[in-house]
Structure formats: structure tokens, C-alpha cells
């Protein structure tokens, strides 16, 4: 296609008196996936000026012991640098020459008859953002020829187990450790093309959630909910789900990744629907929890929903570049503890005491969220969340909380990225989920938390039993971090808007998708809303919505509402001794003490706890039962053993244990 000299054309037409109609026809798409741009970003992260990157695509294969083809799912690292969603392909990038080469299989007649043909070299060159196309059978020859001409340069592959077909002699020159971290750093920051696809996936999934809300009163089984959601997505050309849908009703919602989706809805209070589609390989991840009728079935269900919604809104409000995500995870636990204390589920302690014991994990056991992109749990683990080059401004912003303050509520096995102790700060272009939840897992409560003296003293059994039928509540949105704050890409309704849709039975316009709302902190800065200057948080951070209990001394001074006593007394123990208390005066201390004494916090005290059979089944009086999982449990156990006259005994749980 010839290049149009627009400048020269405009100069010539300037002297003409007639009007001209210019018709342009493009032979290729203007909206190609930016594979070449991604390749250059990876090279910049590798920090090398010469070398070769090799990535294999996913081969076509059959199901095990079957002649039926397995569902094809392209390898995400390969796709990130190629934009090619065809099987049996390979990719090579010559770093010094800046040449991106795609290798595709030859077209075979039997493949065309049964499965249709793939792209020809000319079609692939027009379709993908690449420089050259060759057939796969030429891969070994081309790489060997390149290696012969570049004797002292490295070849980069993704994994130590990866190999280049026909190039085993090149193994001493292969670097299998540098490429994946470099690609992960690139994949965490989404470009405009990627954001467009994630937004589209969110729009389709949000419409599917609306359809479910509008029809939920008609349905009798979880399978119908799953079926409708997938039907809406497929009809909008989003044929792949980012993960297996979770349509959990009643107690099933207490299982985080429940996927049976086959139980009747009769007698259940709530449905937790966690489902999101893929659009052109990019994922969405949305959760809505809603009643199965036109109103809240119980006050307990409404209370838990409102608490989870408050947890989510409090955390989303603070998302912007420079914020440490783990701080928001901690904050979500503190909001949860406040709410559970008010409801009487937690008791006999302050927020600080309950937090330090880790008891809130009985009800909020997972991380606040994760990256989302080509994978629903996208790249961004601990070693990849370090402060990036070129972002020195964040290096001077420490965590909002003291070192290791996350220990009681963080578990590396269950809290996925970016909720990680080594996480640094959110950056513009990241897309993360915010998905707090409150769950009532009967198994976890009976087998760990209630038998443990560390946790059981804070749990009111009588009140807890009233909340067990709720099952669980989770609310999840996908959030884009922008230069000025954040944008919520998820448009599925929540709260009153959600209830109205259930009552009306109308999902809204199905052909025109509702645009995503945009939130900008710079726009909000024009009003007189007071702002914070807490360590680790930008000066543009808005004042939170928290209203902590009067006696709780768990949040920094800056996180108290202004119409409350905006200070923390200097007397007594505090986890925040490093924080300044500029507003603390003797007069305010006296006011705080008077208010504390005149309006004491009413905490529900449990009646005599029901006797529980220990997990091991041993009820002998001289056997001391202690249940441990964290470092704090072990420390408490050591103190308990040292101060008691009895000797802790381990008892086998079954005959097999006795043999061992």
C-alpha cells in the first residue's frame, strides 16, 4: 500500500477553489494487537541490546485417550508478544535488528477438511503486528543460522524446561531465568489496547449479571443461573469464561471456589455469583451477592451485605498510584472487625486485640484482590512487585503500617498478588480486583477457630448461629489505576440499584452497554474535602469512611472521621507509636475519657459456650488441646504450656496415625 503524503496534498489543495472528496481504503486493520510494542517493552525490561527471544505457542492436542480435540487455549506469554491465537505457532524476536518473526504451520488438506485452514503467510503478515512470517518447519534452520552469526549473544526462553525444536546444541547459550520476570513487569502495566479489551469483557459480563438479577426470581436451581450467564456472554461473542462460574447459594457461598452449581435454591437466602468472561483473551472477574427474592430475606443477610459493601467502598476510595495494596488488605480487615463487633459476632475484645489474634480471618480468609489481564489471576507475585525502575517517587513512600503488621491477616498460600508482604505500590495502568467478603464456613469454624482458645474467646456462638444461613457475601469489581486515581471498569449494579433490578425483572438495555464510570482524584480535589498526609499514601488521598469503635486503638490518627475525636490518646499501649498526634491536647484527652466513660461500648458477651468435641475425639481431662496454625498461635501455646502444670499431649486421630 502506498504511503499518503498528507502534507504535500494539503499544500496543493490550498490553491484550489473546488471541494474534493477524499476516499481512503485500508487493506489491513488499524486496530492490530500491539505485539511489536510489547516486544520492545520486554527488551527494555531485559536491559540488553542484543540477543534472541524465543516463545512457543500452544500446540493442538486431543483429550487424553481420545480422538476428540481438547479445547485450545493459547499460551499467554506467546500471545503477549505475537497477538496470534492459532495453534502450533512459534515466535522469534531479534533484539538488535528489532525484527519480530512468526512461524506458522503449513496448511494440510486433512486439517482443512476437518478443522478449517489456518492463516497463510500473507494473511498472517496482514493480520498480526509482526515483521516476518515463515513456516514452522524452517524454525530450527533460521535459529541455527542466527546463532552461527551471533556467537557471543544470548538466547532467552521462558522456562528452564522449555526447549527450541532442533536446537539442543544451543543449550549452553540459553538464558531461562531472565525473560519471564521481564515479561511479567510488562504485563502488569496495561496499555490502551489491553485496557480496551478488559473493559469490553467487563461490559459483557456486567450485562450478563444484569440478566441474572432480572430473572433470579424465576429460577429454581443454581445451574439455571450459570446457564443464563454463559448464554448472555456467548451471544455477545465472548465464548470463553475467564474461569469456571461460581453460582453458590446459601451455605455453598462459604466455599470460596464452589463450582458444582447444581443445588436447588429453595430455602436459601442469598446467591453469590462470581463469574466473568474473556474477550479476545483478556479476562474480567466480577462477583455480586444478591437475595433470591425481591427483598432481603433476613436482617442478618442485609447486615453482612452492607458490611462487605462498606469494606469494598472504603478500599476502592483509596486506589491511586503510590498506594501499597497490602495496606488496603489490612484496612479491609479492620473495617470487617468493626462491623462484626457491632453485630455482636465478635466480642470480648477491642479491634486491636482481635486483629492481633488473627480471628478476623475466620470470616475473611482470602486476599483483597489480584491483578487481572491475560489471566484472571494475572502475573504479579511477590518477587515481581518490587519498585520498578523509573519510579523513584514511590521508593520514599513507606507502608502505612508498622513492619510485619500484616502477619495476623496474611497468608501467602491464600492471599494472591498483589496482596503480598513484598508488594510495593500501585502504578498507572495496573488493573486490579477489589473483592472483600464475609463468610460463614461451618467446617473452618468447627475444626479450627472455635476449638482454639486464641480465637474462641472473641466469637459469640449464640449470635454466630443466627448468621450461619447467610453462607457468604462477596462483592468484586475490576479497577483500572489511572494517573489521577482510578476507574471502575465494572458496571454491574450493587446495593439498591441491584435490588431494584430484581424487583422490576428488567435487566436494562441489552444492546447498548452502560459505560463504565470514571473516578479521578484530581477532579475531586476541587472541593473542600479534607485530605490526608499519612505515610505511604498520596497527599491527594480522601478521608476514609471509617467510624471506628470508641475504644479501638487500631487505626492511625488520620483515619478518624473529623466529627469524631480526631486523635488517639497518648496514654496506654498503641501499635502506632511512630505516628504523630498533632491534634492531641490535654483538653481533648479529658473529653475523650469522659465520652468513653459515659457511653461505654456495648459488646455482646456470650453465654456459656456449648461444649465442643475436640477434633481428635479425646475428652480425657488431663489432655490439653491446643490448635495452632500461625506464629502467634505457637507463641501463645508456648506461654500456655510454661504456665500450666499439665503436659500437653498429642493424641493420634485414627488407627493409621497410631501405626505411624
Curated annotation (Swiss-Prot):
Residues binding Mn(2+) 1, per UniProt: 285, 435, 476
Superkingdom of this protein's organism: Eukaryota
EC number of the protein: 3.4.11.9
InterPro entries: Aminopep_P_N, Creatin/AminoP/Spt16_N, Creatinase/aminopeptidase-like, Pept_M24, Peptidase_M24B_aminopep-P_CS, X-Pro_dipept-like
Binding site for Mn(2+) 2: 274, 285, 476
Region called Disordered, residue ranges: 641-660
GO molecular function annotations of the record: manganese ion binding; metalloaminopeptidase activity
CC cofactor: Mn(2+)
GO biological process terms on file: proteolysis
Pfam families: AMP_N, Peptidase_M24
Known catalytic reactions: Release of any N-terminal amino acid, including proline, that is linked to proline, even from a dipeptide or tripeptide
UniProt remark on cofactor binding: Binds 2 manganese ions per subunit.
Protease listed as a keyword: yes
Keyword annotations of the record: Aminopeptidase, Hydrolase, Manganese, Metal-binding, Metalloprotease, Protease
PANTHER family in alphabetical order: XAA-PRO AMINOPEPTIDASE 3, XAA-PRO AMINOPEPTIDASE AN0832-RELATED
Family: Belongs to the peptidase M24B family.
Name of the molecule in the record: Probable Xaa-Pro aminopeptidase PTRG_10574
Lineage: Eukaryota, Fungi, Dikarya, Ascomycota, Pezizomycotina
Amino acid at each position: 500500500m502506498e504511503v499518503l503524503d498528507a502534507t504535500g496534498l494539503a499544500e496543493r489543495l490550498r490553491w484550489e477553489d473546488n471541494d474534493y472528496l477524499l476516499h481512503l481504503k485500508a487493506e489491513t486493520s488499524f486496530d492490530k494487537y500491539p505485539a511489536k510494542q510489547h516486544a520492545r517493552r520486554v527488551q527494555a525490561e531485559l536491559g540488553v541490546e542484543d540477543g534472541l527471544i524465543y516463545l512457543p505457542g500452544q500446540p493442538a492436542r486431543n483429550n487424553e485417550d481420545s480422538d476428540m480435540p481438547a479445547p485450545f487455549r493459547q499460551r499467554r506469554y506467546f500471545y503477549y508478544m505475537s497477538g496470534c491465537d492459532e495453534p502450533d505457532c512459534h515466535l522469534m524476536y531479534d533484539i538488535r535488528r528489532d525484527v519480530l518473526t512468526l512461524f506458522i504451520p503449513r496448511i494440510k488438506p486433512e486439517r482443512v477438511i476437518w478443522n478449517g485452514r489456518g492463516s497463510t503467510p500473507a494473511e498472517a503478515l496482514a493480520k498480526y503486528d509482526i515483521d516476518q512470517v515463515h513456516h514452522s518447519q524452517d524454525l530450527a534452520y533460521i535459529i541455527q543460522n542466527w546463532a552461527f552469526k551471533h556467537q557471543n549473544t544470548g538466547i532467552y526462553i521462558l522456562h528452564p524446561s522449555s526447549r527450541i525444536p532442533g536446537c539442543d546444541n544451543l543449550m549452553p547459550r540459553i538464558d531461562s531465568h531472565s525473560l519471564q520476570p521481564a515479561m511479567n513487569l510488562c504485563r502488569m502495566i496495561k496499555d490502551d489496547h489491553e485496557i480496551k479489551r478488559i473493559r469490553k469483557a467487563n461490559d459483557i459480563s456486567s450485562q450478563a449479571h444484569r440478566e441474572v438479577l432480572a430473572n433470579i426470581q424465576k429460577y429454581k436451581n443454581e445451574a439455571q443461573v450459570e446457564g443464563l450467564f454463559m448464554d448472555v456472554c456467548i451471544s455477545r461473542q465472548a465464548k470463553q469464561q475467564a474461569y469456571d462460574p461460581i453460582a453458590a447459594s446459601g451455605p455453598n457461598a462459604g466455599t470460596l471456589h464452589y463450582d458444582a452449581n447444581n443445588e436447588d435454591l429453595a430455602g436459601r437466602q442469598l446467591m453469590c455469583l462470581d463469574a466473568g468472561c474473556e474477550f479476545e483473551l483478556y479476562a474480567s472477574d466480577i462477583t455480586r451477592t444478591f437475595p433470591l427474592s425481591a427483598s432481603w430475606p433476613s436482617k442478618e443477610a442485609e447486615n453482612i451485605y452492607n458490611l462487605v459493601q462498606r469494606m469494598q467502598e472504603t478500599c476502592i476510595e483509596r486506589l491511586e498510584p503510590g498506594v501499597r495494596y497490602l495496606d488496603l488488605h489490612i484496612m479491609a480487615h479492620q473495617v470487617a472487625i468493626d462491623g462484626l463487633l457491632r453485630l455482636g459476632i465478635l466480642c470480648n475484645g477491642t479491634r486491636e486485640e482481635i486483629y492481633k489474634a488473627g480471628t478476623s480471618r475466620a470470616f475473611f480468609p482470602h486476599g483483597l484482590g489480584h491483578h487481572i489481564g491475560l489471566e484472571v489471576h494475572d502475573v504479579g507475585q511477590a518477587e515481581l512487585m518490587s519498585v520498578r525502575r523509573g519510579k523513584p517517587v514511590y521508593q520514599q513512600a513507606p507502608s502505612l503500617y508498622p513492619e510485619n503488621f500484616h502477619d495476623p491477616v496474611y497468608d501467602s498460600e491464600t492471599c494472591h498478588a498483589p496482596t503480598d508482604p513484598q508488594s510495593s505500590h500501585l502504578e498507572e495502568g495496573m488493573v486490579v480486583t477489589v473483592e472483600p467478603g464475609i463468610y460463614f464456613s461451618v467446617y473452618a469454624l468447627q475444626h479450627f477457630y472455635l476449638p482454639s482458645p486464641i480465637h474462641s474467646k472473641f466469637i459469640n456462638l449464640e449470635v454466630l448461629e443466627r448468621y450461619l444461613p447467610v453462607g457468604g457475601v462477596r462483592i468484586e469489581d475490576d479497577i483500572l489505576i489511572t494517573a489521577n486515581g482510578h476507574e471502575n471498569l465494572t458496571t454491574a449494579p450493587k446495593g439498591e440499584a441491584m435490588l431494584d433490578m430484581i424487583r422490576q425483572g428488567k435487566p436494562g438495555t441489552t444492546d447498548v452497554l452502560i459505560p463504565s464510570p470514571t473516578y479521578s482524584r484530581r477532579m475531586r480535589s476541587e472541593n473542600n474535602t479534607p485530605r490526608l498526609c499519612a505515610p505511604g499514601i498520596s497527599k491527594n488521598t480522601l478521608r476514609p469512611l471509617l467510624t471506628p469503635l470508641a475504644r479501638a486503638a487500631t487505626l492511625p490518627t488520620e483515619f478518624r472521621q473529623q466529627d469524631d475525636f480526631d486523635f488517639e490518646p497518648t496514654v496506654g499501649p498503641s501499635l502506632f507509636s511512630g505516628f504523630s498526634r498533632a491534634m492531641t491536647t490535654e483538653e481533648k484527652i479529658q473529653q475523650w475519657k469522659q465520652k468513653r466513660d459515659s457511653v461505654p461500648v456495648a459488646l455482646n458477651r456470650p453465654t456459656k459456650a456449648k461444649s465442643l468435641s475436640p477434633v481428635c475425639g479425646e475428652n480425657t481431662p488431663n489432655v490439653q488441646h491446643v490448635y495452632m496454625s500461625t506464629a502467634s498461635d505457637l507463641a501463645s501455646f508456648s506461654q500456655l504450656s510454661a504456665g500450666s502444670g499439665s503436659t500437653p499431649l498429642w493424641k493420634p486421630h485414627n488407627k493409621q496415625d497410631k501405626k505411624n
